[in-house]
Amino acid sequence: MTITETNPSLPYAADDPRGLLLRSWAVATDVAASVGPDRLDDPTPCDEFDAATVRAHLLSVGQRVAALGRGEDPFSVGEGVDAVPGDDWRTAFAAAGMDVAAAWADDDLLDRTITLPWAEAPGAGILAMYVSEIVVHTWDLARATGQSPTWDDDVVATGFAALQIGLPDEGRIEAFEAARANMPEGTEDFTYPFDAALPVADGAAPIDRLVAWSGRDPRWTA
């Protein structure tokens, strides 16, 4: 069985961030592939993005993770695409997942320090950070298009822990402005992606806690 089939985490230990990321990517793939052409203009919890834009952004996130593993500049990857060959988004997302697995095949990458404008951490920590981004934007796309995916508890827990470290409750805007100063040329219009964390009820589902920490209302509807 390969990573593109039903168990993308099979080659990895249970706590390996590569497997966790690929499991989050499998959910993203299913959600992206299930967006009908009549839903592309639908609003999303990302106020400035419609469903088509969020889907394109998600694909670029996977491509950037692969670029990081290869030691390339992740910002060389465009923000998103308007179309993929044959309008086959499942194949495009699956290909990005395979690229991620190949690019991060070397175990040593998990301990290697990677520097981004907003973070410097070992590869394992960077992957966990991207788990949070993938899960949040998959939730955005699913909520916008009437889908109800489920995520493994350990995937959500990994993403939430990384988000709490990388996106503290206090000083978010200041941290973003500091990161913006280090962004490469051509990304000056990069907008602040997270609002203040929202409160959730005691006993809220893990996915609701994660998206609320990112500033999204878990009860959001179009």
Please report, for each region that a protein language model flagged, where it lies by residue.
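Extended, alpha-helix-rich binding/interface surfaces that flank or overlap catalytic cores
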Residues: V54
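Helical hydrophobic small-molecule/effector-binding pocket
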Residues: M98-D111
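Structured surface interface patches that mediate subunit assembly and partner/cofactor docking
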Residues: T2-G19, S24-V27, S34-D47, A67-V84, ...
